[in-house]
Amino acid sequence: MKKYQLGEFEEVVILTIAILYKEAYGVAIKKEIETRLARNVSMGAMHTALVRLEDKGYIKSLPGEETEERMGRPRRYYQITALGKKAMEYSKETRNALWSAIPKVSLNLKIVG
């Protein structure tokens, strides 16, 4: 059963929203991911992930103030919901359980062959 489902990029996005806290809007999230992970992110991929996370109820968006630089349109700020926090915790617990289950010998790269 898929209790909470976060794709890899969705997990990166929701973690970044948590990092940015009250400054989590599209371009800021994109830049933070690119800086922290040295990874290029398209605005299309970012938008898709934000829509999916909001559709799942893991985040919510709120309009900010209108700005001239955005031609009067407000930024959309993102916040993690209680359900989103649970999804993040579930994802972390799942990954930690998998890492803990790996036998040390499994990661011994001195394989003779």
Predicted regions, residues:
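Amphipathic alpha-helical dimerization/coiled-coil segments
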Residues: 83-113
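N-terminal helix-turn-helix DNA-binding core of bacterial DNA-binding proteins
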Residues: 4-45
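Basic, short loop/linker segments at the boundary and entry of helix-turn-helix/winged-helix-like folds
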Residues: 1-6, 78
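Short aromatic/hydrophobic contact patches that present stacked aromatics
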Residues: 14, 77-79
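Basic amphipathic alpha-helical segments that dock to polyanions
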Residues: 46-48, 52-53
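Alpha-helical residues within the helix-turn-helix
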Residues: 31, 54-55
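Beta-hairpin "wing" of winged helix-turn-helix
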Residues: 56-71
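Exposed loop/turn and edge beta-strand positions of beta-sandwich/beta-sheet ligand-binding modules
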Residues: 74
